[in-house]
């Protein structure tokens, strides 16, 4: 093992350990990046001011509008009582027994509708908070449910999902987003069912221990009296959600169909979120005094979330430029076994090393894709299987403690790694990892 590869492993382990212990990723990530750089013989200032800051800044440049608007949307829904009304209505409709499903299903629908998982975290959390309060469940169980719905099958396995993890393989294998539908459906079953069973087991475990919902001291929510709100107020929670999904998917199509304009996805999500915010505000005009404070709190809250994520991305940027990363890539690409198994291992390892599903998969496929496409010799079935295994594998080791989505989810929910990461790890890391490797061996 080269010293540089050892540095990557040491830096990664240190990053995960300190993040799990609750230390701020804002200083932990650059320190761990420096460890990687020093052991790789890389200039410290070049690594920090150059590669680290560039990776961090590029991420903020790309994602800040979505984080900002997503946080504002979530806070408007929260402080106006719309999220609470919708959450209470869902609990009344299906009962507190199915509180987990009431959180997981909306996450699945929104991510399958094309909404970024980062945005879903901001949008769903206020509603989930209300659902878990109404069901008297520990709020520390909520991140696991959100992660299961947002970071799982609709990100990688469901046929036709518009998430980037399902789009990247099409460039390498000439496939479509519907690739390997049967394999995809099997993957959905073996990933979602165990995850849901686990979450329900955690609920039963918490009830046996006598645990209850404990309000988050940092969660500022107007104490709306349910009797003071009209019985139809839950509509103010569901309509903005529908508007966001429809605008994200329908508006770009209409623009292209009738004006010949191709709207970029990052522009589309901004327009959709602005539409959702405006509709939420219009439906709650009777609470006009609440709206500006909600927008202000949402804007402030978005900064911490995106900085946590961007710092983790900066660490991955340093890892990718040191010599040891080439060694890691070589190990991943030369795994014994079938091409499907080799691909599954490679994508998982590189997604874990970079802390990014799309980043790890892009690196793996840029090296593996042409080679495997050639080995498939035009066999459509094999190419589609390669597509699906790559996509599913990207959602395995990516959700280690330093993953940006994990950090965002924990920051938004004000939970620590120690309190909630185990549920995220089991449902979005261990189960997808085992599933991807198992399916690759079939």
What is each of the regions a protein language model found here?
Residues 7-19, 30-39, 69-72, 106-111, ...:
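Hydrophobic core segments of alpha-helical transmembrane domains in multi-pass membrane transport
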Residues 71, 85-87, 119-131, 160-172, ...:
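Re-entrant/interfacial helical elements at transmembrane boundaries that shape
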Residues 97-110, 137-154, 180-185, 189, ...:
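Alpha-helical transmembrane segments of multi-pass membrane proteins
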Residues 1-72, 85, 89, 93, ...:
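Hydrophobic transmembrane alpha-helices of multi-pass solute/ion transporters
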Residues 2, 39-40, 182-294, 408, ...:
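Long, contiguous bundles of hydrophobic transmembrane helices that form the permeation core
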Residues 66-70, 93-130, 306-314, 328, ...:
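Hydrophobic alpha-helical transmembrane segments of multi-pass integral membrane proteins
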Residues 22-25, 60-63, 74-84, 111-123, ...:
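Short helix-coil transition sites and intra-membrane helix breaks within transmembrane domains
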Residues 90, 94-95, 299, 408-430:
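Interfacial loop-to-transmembrane junctions
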């Amino acid at each position: 093992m080269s010293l540089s590869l050892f540095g990557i492993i040491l830096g990664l382990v240190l990053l995960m350990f300190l993040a799990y212990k609750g230390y701020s990723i804002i200083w932990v990530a650059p320190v761990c990046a420096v460890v990687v750089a020093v052991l790789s013989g890389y200039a410290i200032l070049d690594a920090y001011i150059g590669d680290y800051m560039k990776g961090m800044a590029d991420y903020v440049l790309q994602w800040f509008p979505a984080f900002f608007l997503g946080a504002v949307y979530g806070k408007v829904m929260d402080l106006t009582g719309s999220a609470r009304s919708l959450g209470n209505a869902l609990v009344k409709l299906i009962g507190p027994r199915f509180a987990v499903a009431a959180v997981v299903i909306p996450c699945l629908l929104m991510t399958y509708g094309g909404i970024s998982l980062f945005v879903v975290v901001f949008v769903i959390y206020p509603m989930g908070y209300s659902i878990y309060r109404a069901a008297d469940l520990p709020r520390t169980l909520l991140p696991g449910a959100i992660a299961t719905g947002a970071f799982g099958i609709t990100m990688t396995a469901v046929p036709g999902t518009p998430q980037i993890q399902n789009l990247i393989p099409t460039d390498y294998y000439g496939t479509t987003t519907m690739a390997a539908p049967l394999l995809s459906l099997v993957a959905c079953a073996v990933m979602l069912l165990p995850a849901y069973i686990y979450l329900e087991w955690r609920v039963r475990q918490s009830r046996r221990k006598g645990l209850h919902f404990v309000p988050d001291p940092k969660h500022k929510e107007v104490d709306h009296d349910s009797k003071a709100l009209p019985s139809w107020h839950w509509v103010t929670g569901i309509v903005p959600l529908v508007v966001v999904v429809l605008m994200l998917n329908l508006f770009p199509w209409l623009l292209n169909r009738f004006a010949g304009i191709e709207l970029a996805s990052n522009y589309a999500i901004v327009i959709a979120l602005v539409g959702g915010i405006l509709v939420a505000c219009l439906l709650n005009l009777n609470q006009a005094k609440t709206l500006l404070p909600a927008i202000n709190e949402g804007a402030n809250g978005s900064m911490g979330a995106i900085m946590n994520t961007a710092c983790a991305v900066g660490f991955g940027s340093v890892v990718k430029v040191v010599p040891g990363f080439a060694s890691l890539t070589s190990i991943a690409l030369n795994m014994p076994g079938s091409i499907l198994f080799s691909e599954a291992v490679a994508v998982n390892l590189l997604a874990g090393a970079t802390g990014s599903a799309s980043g790890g998969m892009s690196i793996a496929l840029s090296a593996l894709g042409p080679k495997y496409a050639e080995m498939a010799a035009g066999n459509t079935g094999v190419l589609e299987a390669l597509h699906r295994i790559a996509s599913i594998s990207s959602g395995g080791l990516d959700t280690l403690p330093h993953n940006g989505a994990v950090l965002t989810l924990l920051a938004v929910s004000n939970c620590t790694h120690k309190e909630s990461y185990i549920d995220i790890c089991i449902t979005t890391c261990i189960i997808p990892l085992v599933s991807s490797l198992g399916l690759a061996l079939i």
